[in-house]
């Protein structure tokens, strides 16, 4: 593992700048370049972020060009059209897949041979597209997937039970979007199954918890226009796991090749990640209902993906 850790961020909007700030605060990486169509904004953000460095650890932060990607360990993409009130993430695909192709072509032209981390929506489809456009191994193209959804899930359960969210373990699987679902059969609190904390009489509470998680982004968008702090924190966590070679298990958008009975698709599932990217996909033993939900989520993504890729071919 080389000592110098270099990150290039493509997309300096609300998510991108929040991610950059999180990396500064959490002392992630030693070099951080920022690319955006608005060059002045990247210059201003690099200056502003640099002034936070004395409160953290040394880091070089600058306005970058695509040529700077050539020796980056990680290229993180948050660029794209934002989700509007009333829009689903899948509604964004036609606009954002063309933007993504342009970005990936520029990055690869630099000689980049690191790891892509995609956060632009719809993230599962754009991660698949990035893999196709880049020609990189599937292990080195990763999407943020259901990492934020899972954090919301754990927090909501913790709030309901009045426990620390760090003692809640469970995953949201599938699409980062409307067809996602909770793997209740593998959700534990303090080592005990969730069913030992929430009785059958409280089934409605479990349903309410999930709906609040699934629809959280819509509520935030309606109230403040966009979500960015949560996903920025999720990206920072993934970045740390990769650069520090943690072999951490995180719920990401990863390529399934027979896992969960799925093939040729990027979708949210737990995976072991380290400096080489995805080391291993954790295949949970889902119950029949969850298997059907996973299939439904994959089928929904496949249909949109096939239509979107035809635009580019």
Swiss-Prot record:
* GO biological process entries: glycolytic process; lactate metabolic process; pyruvate metabolic process
Q: What is its EC number?
A: 1.1.1.27
Could you say which residues bind NAD(+) here? 15, 36, 41, 66, 119-121, 144
Please state what class of enzyme this protein is. oxidoreductase
List, alphabetically, the Pfam families matched.
Ldh_1_C, Ldh_1_N
Residues binding substrate are: 83, 89, 121-124, 149-152, 227
Compartment(s) of residence: Cytoplasm
* A GO CC annotation given for this chain: cytoplasm
Q: Which InterPro entries match?
A: L-lactate/malate_DH (IPR001557), L-lactate_DH (IPR011304), L-lactate_DH_AS (IPR018177), Lactate/malate_DH_C (IPR022383), Lactate/malate_DH_N (IPR001236), Lactate_DH/Glyco_Ohase_4_C (IPR015955), NAD(P)-bd_dom_sf (IPR036291)
Q: In which pathway does it act?
A: Fermentation; pyruvate fermentation to lactate; (S)-lactate from pyruvate: step 1/1
Activity control = Allosterically activated by fructose 1,6-bisphosphate (FBP).
Q: Which residues bind beta-D-fructose 1,6-bisphosphate?
A: 154, 169
Record's catalysed reaction(s)? (S)-lactate + NAD(+) = pyruvate + NADH + H(+)
Positions of the catalytic residues: 176 (proton acceptor)
Q: What are the protein's UniProt keywords?
A: Allosteric enzyme, Cytoplasm, NAD, Oxidoreductase, Phosphoprotein
Residues that bear Phosphotyrosine? 218
Q: What GO molecular function annotation could you give as one example from this UniProt entry? A: L-lactate dehydrogenase activity
Q: Which family does it belong to?
A: Belongs to the LDH/MDH superfamily. LDH family.
Q: How does it assemble?
A: Homotetramer.
Q: Which NCBIfam families match?
A: L-LDH-NAD (TIGR01771), PRK00066.1 (NF000824), PRK06223.1 (NF004863)
Q: Briefly state the protein's biological role.
A: Catalyzes the conversion of lactate to pyruvate.
Q: What is this protein called?
A: L-lactate dehydrogenase 1
What is the scientific name of the source organism?
A: Listeria monocytogenes serovar 1/2a (strain ATCC BAA-679 / EGD-e)
């Amino acid at each position: 593992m080389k000592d110098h850790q270099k990150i290039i961020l493509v997309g300096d909007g609300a998510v991108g700048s929040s991610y950059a700030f999180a990396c500064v605060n959490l002392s992630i990486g030693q070099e951080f370049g920022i690319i955006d169509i608005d060059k002045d904004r990247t210059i201003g953000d690099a200056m502003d972020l640099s002034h936070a460095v004395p409160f953290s650890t040394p880091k070089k932060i600058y306005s970058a060009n695509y040529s700077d990607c050539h020796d980056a360990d990680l290229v993180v993409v948050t660029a794209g059209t934002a989700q509007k009130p009333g829009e689903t993430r899948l509604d964004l695909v036609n606009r954002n897949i063309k933007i993504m192709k342009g970005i990936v072509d520029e990055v690869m032209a630099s000689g980049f041979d690191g790891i892509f981390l995609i956060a632009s929506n719809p993230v599962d489809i754009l991660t698949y597209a990035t893999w196709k456009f880049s020609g990189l191994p599937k292990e080195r193209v990763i999407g943020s997937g259901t990492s934020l959804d899972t954090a919301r899930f754990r927090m909501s359960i913790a709030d309901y039970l009045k426990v620390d969210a760090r003692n809640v373990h469970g995953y949201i699987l599938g699409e980062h979007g409307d067809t996602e679902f909770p793997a209740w059969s593998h959700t534990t609190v303090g080592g005990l199954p969730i069913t030992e904390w929430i009785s059958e009489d409280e089934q409605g509470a479990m349903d309410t918890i999930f709906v609040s998680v699934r629809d959280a982004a819509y509520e935030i968008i309606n109230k403040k226009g966009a979500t960015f702090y949560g996903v920025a924190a999720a990206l920072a966590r993934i970045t740390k796991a990769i650069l520090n070679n943690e072999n951490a298990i995180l719920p990401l958008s990863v390529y399934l090749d027979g896992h969960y009975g799925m093939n040729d698709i990027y979708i949210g599932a737990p995976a072991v990640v380290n400096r080489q990217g995805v080391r291993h996909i954790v295949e949970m033993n889902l119950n029949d209902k969850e298997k059907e939900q996973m299939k439904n989520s994959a089928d929904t993504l496949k249909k949109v993906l096939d239509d979107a890729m035809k635009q580019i071919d």
